């Protein structure tokens, strides 16, 4: 058996591929984002303001409607000193771990210049633990990062229409589209009706054709001459400037308008009027548009808006604004000045439009502005540059954007999501403050009277409690915790929805390389929408995912590492990291595999600019824990990644014999280990305390004490337990693990056990992925786990008096109350079974039905004779175990309980679950199955030296599934077992077949890893040799004890009176329509009659038959099923009067009301 406390020396065994970079902290995405939100670095630079500071800046100052007073913000502070409870106390008491937010606010009066200053409490902000989680109402939660469409400009071609959208963070969506039939460009505001592009530009103030032409085209001067060649060259050109000539009266008059096409008779006119030069559009000029779309728009204007030529020959700004407003707000009268200001505010003021830091960055990058534009609103240049670029896309000079490219999708982490939530809450607060300003007395008013924190508190509570992105932490094991914090979700508010997301969004995209894992994603409707971050990826300041690369200069890999976003990466050739790189970084091959823009080729090392930092940079943490991943089919690798997260922590965990080197990092960053704060010497170790004397202590008393958590319940009811791994006298460094957590061993992740496997069918017990396992595995507790259930009860105040905890429970035998103390609470250490009382509690019964005799007795004997009901907390069905803890929260001791509750008692029951038939087990390669039989070890097939196998898997489960990694892992594991070696074989650099064969030879096994096996039952040799190895197997959180369920009678649905469904409701099975058909087919009339009536929903018949069974009398006839009554009531709901009569013509009552009416009728007829 694997010895506990054994030190493990892992050796690298693989292809010697250089790793240029250590793994970063794996939960940085959570911690850094929240620190930015809390502004821990206290940035005050205007351009860098984000998080809480930006929330205050966008809301304040708040001015009253008549502008006589204003609330001004000075600064905020987080009052860390007044945090009342620690993380553990918050968990026990069901509270939120948070810090009070206070803000210094001035109330400024304009007339008197008086300032009233106050430090105002603005609510509690939940704090993130150092593990990257939040504790909300006593439960650990994680805020998952969201991946969404980046603000900015997008050019697309959908359903045959070329369009572009400027997507803001907040504000009006501006779209442009090209009408291909008529070759016109249109603008759309918030997806309303179309507005001609040039009309929209005129509304913005570009009031003449000349101005509009200058935005899109370069111009050139042309001579007018009767020369034939020059004459013909001018035909078909377009005027860029108006042409004026002198009239007879000496006045200048416009002869031709800019935007007109030149015809031969125009040239004749010009020659006649002695015009020597004209300015025309140079379509082929640098930065000019080679398209007549804008000119077509001018022609369209003439048709649609026919101005009075005597006054003006083209639409004015006023005409354009009227046209725009007839689309935005049809039917609303608006003045010219208001319309102009409103349109300006719509795009160019920060109050109404915000493209965000990201949107601005994207626009600057797209349109190559010579000096970067600052600010987060649009500028006019953005609008016409977007139109120009769209026309270039249409004529094929530019390409459309790929919406799934990671340059167009960005990450919103906790901090940003929280900022958005608070901004909305603060704007509600602002509205309330404005209303109060106009209604309060100015003399006595204080800042506190104006600010209401209700919307802020409610928004925070709602976000953490109910948002789709705030999730109950997946805490089955450390890996599940870690991956949950690194998850990226495309769903949620402002994201996609499952039903509308197509294949393209879910697909693996070439930009995912090194940023998002192509393997780890759920199976089912969320596939591709929920993904994991790759190992080395990080999020940059704009929210885009970046991957690290090593710079390559002249075919030599330097040690310089650069992070590239998906947009930057598109420009370079990026080489693959391989074993052909020398110690000095020189690439010793003529050709290197590389990629650019999703194409994979081989080129000379001199031509590549960057190189991957590590082979495992393309996958996520879960996938990089699978050895020999490169030999598995991707679908099975996906299952393997997902199932490792479901592995239940075992009582005696063991790290994998064939690991990947990620086990240490994964356990370290998950936050389950206890790490030393300072270097020093261990002075004291017990099961729950470690004391370390630091090297650089202030004095002898300055010691670090660490308290370990014992037998804590996790969110998924597994056991969270820490145990020391250092001894007295050991020297430890700062950051070194000193205690293991759940599913870890010596600071390494240990999700399962290494067991001896044979791939051999055995009497059909491993048919269809079933697993045959040896009893030795159960006997030695190899796969035993502890599960902890929490049951709680409230002691309430009722209308008839308070409930009472007591061990004096009516009608209960002394024996059933043996384990309760004087207050009726079970003692710790008791073994309990279903139905046992955990907390004795009685509730007063209503006294309305008491007889006068009882009242007399009550008045004589007082409380004792009063009737009480037994409402004790009992062990639910299917639960048994040992009581390990009882926690009590009392109102009179200052605990915050819900209204009407005086005390809450929580009882924790721990159950030891051994492996049994029906439990789900799996390897790391997606090879899963159910335990079908546990065989005595003497009956298991055994090797020539007498060693029986631990587990038999079906060989047919390997070839069709194409997960050969399990075979290679088993071979190397077998050699490791014999040689007592532990291997580190990282993904994509795992040992070759020759290396594995060398190890097998060294261990004295055949290189095929096939040995002769004997049948345990007969002792005879199997016909063929059998493949034997050591495989790492996990027990998954799908335990048969949690799924098995039986019911005799139980709760019924109120309306239909049919049993409820499901184990959680202690439900039964419904005999539905199809089951009735089956019985009808057999003509089983009597069975059917009782199944449909008295065994099901005939309430009257049900109680009658029960009575007759108890009394031993013959059963009475059946009554009317409740479902029939439901049908009758539905018909009555349709205003159809529905009554039933028996053979004698008497009405049969269907409801209690019917009974009353029939009784009334009888009594009235009797009179």
From Swiss-Prot:
GO-annotated molecular function: DNA binding; DNA-directed RNA polymerase activity; ribonucleoside binding
PANTHER family referenced in this protein's UniProt entry, alphabetically: DNA-DIRECTED RNA POLYMERASE I SUBUNIT 2
A single Gene Ontology CC term: DNA-directed RNA polymerase complex
NCBIfam families: PRK00405.1, rpoB
Keywords annotated in UniProt: DNA-directed RNA polymerase, Nucleotidyltransferase, Transcription, Transferase
Name of protein: DNA-directed RNA polymerase subunit beta
Alphabetical list of Pfam families matching this protein: RNA_pol_Rpb2_1, RNA_pol_Rpb2_2, RNA_pol_Rpb2_3, RNA_pol_Rpb2_45, RNA_pol_Rpb2_6, RNA_pol_Rpb2_7
Organism, as annotated: Treponema denticola (strain ATCC 35405 / DSM 14222 / CIP 103919 / JCM 8153 / KCTC 15104)
Superkingdom as given in the UniProt entry: Bacteria
Documented EC number(s): 2.7.7.6
Biological function: DNA-dependent RNA polymerase catalyzes the transcription of DNA into RNA using the four ribonucleoside triphosphates as substrates.
Family, as annotated: Belongs to the RNA polymerase beta chain family.
Biological process (GO), any one: DNA-templated transcription
Quaternary data: The RNAP catalytic core consists of 2 alpha, 1 beta, 1 beta' and 1 omega subunit. When a sigma factor is associated with the core the holoenzyme is formed, which can initiate transcription.
Catalytic reaction annotation: RNA(n) + a ribonucleoside 5'-triphosphate = RNA(n+1) + diphosphate
């Amino acid at each position: 058996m694997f010895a506990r406390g054994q030190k493990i020396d892992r050796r690298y065994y693989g292809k010697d591929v250089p790793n240029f970079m250590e793994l970063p902290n794996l939960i940085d995405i959570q911690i850094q984002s929240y620190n930015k939100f809390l502004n821990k670095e206290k940035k005050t630079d205007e351009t860098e303001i984000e998080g809480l500071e930006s929330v205050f800046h966008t809301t304040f100052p708040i001015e009253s409607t008549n502008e006589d007073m204003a609330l001004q913000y000075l600064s905020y502070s987080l009052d860390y000193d007044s945090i009342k409870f620690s993380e553990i106390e918050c968990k026990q008491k069901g509270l939120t771990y948070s810090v009070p937010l206070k803000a210094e606010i001035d109330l400024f009066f304009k007339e008197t210049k008086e300032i009233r200053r106050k430090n105002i409490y603005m609510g509690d902000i939940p704090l993130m633990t150092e593990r990257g989680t939040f504790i909300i109402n006593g439960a650990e939660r994680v805020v998952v990062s969201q991946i969404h469409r980046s603000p900015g400009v997008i050019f697309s071609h959908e359903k045959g229409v070329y369009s572009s959208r400027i997507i803001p963070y907040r504000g009006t969506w501006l779209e442009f589209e090209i009408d291909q039939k008529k070759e016109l460009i249109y603008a759309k505001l918030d997806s309303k009706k179309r507005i001609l592009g040039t009309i929209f530009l005129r509304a913005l103030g570009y009031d003449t054709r000349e101005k509009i032409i200058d935005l899109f085209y370069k111009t050139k001067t042309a001579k007018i001459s009767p020369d034939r060649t020059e004459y013909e060259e001018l035909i078909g050109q377009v005027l860029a400037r108006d042409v004026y000539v002198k009239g007879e009266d000496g006045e200048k008059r416009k002869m031709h308008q800019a935007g007109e096409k030149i015809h031969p008779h125009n040239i004749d006119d010009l020659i006649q009027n002695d015009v020597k030069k004209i300015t025309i559009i140079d379509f082929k000029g640098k930065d000019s548009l080679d398209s007549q779309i804008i000119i077509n728009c001018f022609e369209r204007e003439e048709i649609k808006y026919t101005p009075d030529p005597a006054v003006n020959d083209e639409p004015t700004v006023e005409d354009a604004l009227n046209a725009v407003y007839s689309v935005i707000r049809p039917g609303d009268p608006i003045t010219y000045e208001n319309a102009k200001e409103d349109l300006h505010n719509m795009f160019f003021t920060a109050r109404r439009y915000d493209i965000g830091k990201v949107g601005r960055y994207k626009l600057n990058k797209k349109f190559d502005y010579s000096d970067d534009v600052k600010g987060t609103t649009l500028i006019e240049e953005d609008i016409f540059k977007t139109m120009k670029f769209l026309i270039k896309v249409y004529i094929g000079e530019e390409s459309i954007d790929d919406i799934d490219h990671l340059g167009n999708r960005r990450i919103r982490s906790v901090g940003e999501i929280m900022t958005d939530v608070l901004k909305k809450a603060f704007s509600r607060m602002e509205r309330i403050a404005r209303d109060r300003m106009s209604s309060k007395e100015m003399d006595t008013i204080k800042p506190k009277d104006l600010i209401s924190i209700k919307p802020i508190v409610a928004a925070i509570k709602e976000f953490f409690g109910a948002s789709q992105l705030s999730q109950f932490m997946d805490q089955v094991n450390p890996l599940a915790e870690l991956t949950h914090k690194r998850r990226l979700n495309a769903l949620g508010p402002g994201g996609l929805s499952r039903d509308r997301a197509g294949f393209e969004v879910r697909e693996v995209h070439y930009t995912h390389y090194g940023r998002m894992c192509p393997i780890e994603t759920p199976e089912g409707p969320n596939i591709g929408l929920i993904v994991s971050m790759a190992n080395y990826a990080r999020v940059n300041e704009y929210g885009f995912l970046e991957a690290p690369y090593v710079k390559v200069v002249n075919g030599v890999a330097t040690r310089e590492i650069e992070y590239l976003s998906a947009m930057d990466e598109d420009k370079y050739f990026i080489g693959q990291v391989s074993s052909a790189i020398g110690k000095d970084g020189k690439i010793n091959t003529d050709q290197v595999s590389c990629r650019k823009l999703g194409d994979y080729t081989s080129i000379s090392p001199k031509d590549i600019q960057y190189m991957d930092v590590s082979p495992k940079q393309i996958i996520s943490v879960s996938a990089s824990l699978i050895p020999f991943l490169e030999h598995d089919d991707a679908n099975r690798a996906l299952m393997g990644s997902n199932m490792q997260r479901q592995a239940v922590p075992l009582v005696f965990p063991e790290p994998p014999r064939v690991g990947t080197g990620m086990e240490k990092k994964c356990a370290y960053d998950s936050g389950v280990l206890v790490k030393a704060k300072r270097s020093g010497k261990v002075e004291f170790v017990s099961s729950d305390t470690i004391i370390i004397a630091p090297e650089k202590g202030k004095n002898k008393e300055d010691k670090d004490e660490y308290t370990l958590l014992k037998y804590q319940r996790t969110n998924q009811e597994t056991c969270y337990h820490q145990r020391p791994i250092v001894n007295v006298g050991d020297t430890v460094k700062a950051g070194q693990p000193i205690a293991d957590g759940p599913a870890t061993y010596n600071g390494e992740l240990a999700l399962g056990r290494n067991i001896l496997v044979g791939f051999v069918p055995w009497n059909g017990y491993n048919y269809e992925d079933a697993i045959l396992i040896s009893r030795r595995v159960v006997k030695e507790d190899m796969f035993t786990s502890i599960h902890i259930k929490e049951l709680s009860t409230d002691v309430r105040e009722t209308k008839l008096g308070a409930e009472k905890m007591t061990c004096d429970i009516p009608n209960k035998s002394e024996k059933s109350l043996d384990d309760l103390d004087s207050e009726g609470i079970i003692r710790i250490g008791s073994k309990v079974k279903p139905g046992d009382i955990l907390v004795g509690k009685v509730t007063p019964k209503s006294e309305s039905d008491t007889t006068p005799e009882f009242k007399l007795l009550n008045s004589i004997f007082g409380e004792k004779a009063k009737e009480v009901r037994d409402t004790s907390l009992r062990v639910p069905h299917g639960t048994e175990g040992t009581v390990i803890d009882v926690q009590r929260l009392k109102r009179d001791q200052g605990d915050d309980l819900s209204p009407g509750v005086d005390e809450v008692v929580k009882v924790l029951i721990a159950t030891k679950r051994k492996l049994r038939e029906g439990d789900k087990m799996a390897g790391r390669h997606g090879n899963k199955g159910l335990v079908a039989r546990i065989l005595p070890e003497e009956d298991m097939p055994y090797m020539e030296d007498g060693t029986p196998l631990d587990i038999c898997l079906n060989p047919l489960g390997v070839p069709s599934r194409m997960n050969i990694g399990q075979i290679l892992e088993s071979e190397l594991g077998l050699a490791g077992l014999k040689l007592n070696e532990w291997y580190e074989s990282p993904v994509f650099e795992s040992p070759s077949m020759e290396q594995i064969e060398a190890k097998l030879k060294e261990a004295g096994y055949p290189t095929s890893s096939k040995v002769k096996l004997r049948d345990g039952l007969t002792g005879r040799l199997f016909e063929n040799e059998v493949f034997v190895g050591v495989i790492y197997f996990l027990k998954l959180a799908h335990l048969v004890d949690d799924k098995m369920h039986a019911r005799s009678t139980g709760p019924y649905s109120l309306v239909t009176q049919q049993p409820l469904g499901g184990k959680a409701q202690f439900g039964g099975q419904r005999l539905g329509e199809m089951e009735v058909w089956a019985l009808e087919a057999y003509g089983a009339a009597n069975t059917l009659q009782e199944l449909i009536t008295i065994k099901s929903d005939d309430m009257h018949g049900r109680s009658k038959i029960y009575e007759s069974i108890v009394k031993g009398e013959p059963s009475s006839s059946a009554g009317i099923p409740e479902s029939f009554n439901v049908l009758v009531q539905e018909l009555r709901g349709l205003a159809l009067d529905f009554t039933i009569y028996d053979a004698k013509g008497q009405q049969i009552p269907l409801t209690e009301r019917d009974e009353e009416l029939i009784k009334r009728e009888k009594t009235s007829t009797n009179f």
